[in-house]
Amino acid sequence: MKSIAVCAVCYNRKDSLARLLSSLDAACYPVPVTLIISIDRSDTTAVEEYADGYVWRHGEKRVVKHQKNLGLRRHILSIGDWLEEFDAIVVLEDDIYVAPSFYYYAQQCVERFADDMGVAGISLYKYPYCADSRQPFMPMVTDSDVFLMKRAVSWGQVWMREQWLEFKKWYDVHSEPFGVLPHLPRGVCEWPESSWLKYHIRYCIEEDKSFVVPYTSLSTCFCDLGTHAVKRQTHTQTVLLQGEKRHWNLNPTVTYDGFFEAECLYGHFSEVLGVRKEELCIDLYGSKGNRMGRRYWLTREQLPFKVVRSYALEMKPWELNVLHEIEGREIFLYDTSVGAKRPHEPDNDKKADYYLYSTDLDVRSILREKVMKTLVDAKHAVFGQNEE
């Protein structure tokens, strides 16, 4: 059995740490677990005092108090040093909250993927949206409990010894600041230099490494105010697995790239049209912009190029419309080497909004309810709550 420690990474947010530790305390553990509380130097001792007094009921507790301020990037990366002692480590920043079964999941994933060097790490977190476009992210569902994504995760993750050592070798060569690169998400490139995650994401994309991601999240993020958050937000909250689940089917057959695009579409177009992967830009979320200059471009944008194929925006997730050849005029495969008149589909933006954000309710009904509520609120403001 692999040894797996849990590390709570802290700075100056005592209440955040207390919330994280409450979720860890309520979780299920099949074996004694070492809890590491790693605290970066700040101008308060409240976090250190809380950590010292905290009683960990599930195994050994170790409190690390850094005497100098490392900063977020150096602090997070230093956690990897614990892999000299443990086979794997669950890394949790203090604004994370874990599901009761997170350790069972981590344990089984480590046993399954520890020798797979194509896997860079294990995510506890499942994105509810594409991090680059902020549109809903719906992965294709299979009989597996996990899928693969060529993008590192920071809102609950597991690092394994051999995979981490390989990343560290890469990082030691690529640790210098970098600007916008065409093969990386623009937003990631523009993150501040205090970000460690931008380097791990770059590593996954450039070295063709994947994170294992659950279909149902084992962690969620409160996005508390801190180094990279200037206001409280809820978009990082995701559906959290409840109850005690002890067994996972860990046979991923679906892979997404670092831009949240389905990699199976490369194989589809290779089989159907003979288009090679190196010639194709899959850009359904619109985050790539074909900055690599690929000849074929799959996108929802209406562009002045020859349309090779077009598809509907009906099945979910949207890549199924392509895989099942559902004809329509919402998704276009262009040959950018041939200029042509732009497609004229003026209602496509509205259709996309309805497709992405509506429920079974008609959009007009939703708008009608909003208008009526506004009128009622205005009436109450003028005449009082009890006015008929």
Write out the residue ranges for each language-model feature:
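Peripheral/terminal regions associated with large enzymatic or DNA-binding modules
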Residues: 1-92, 96-388
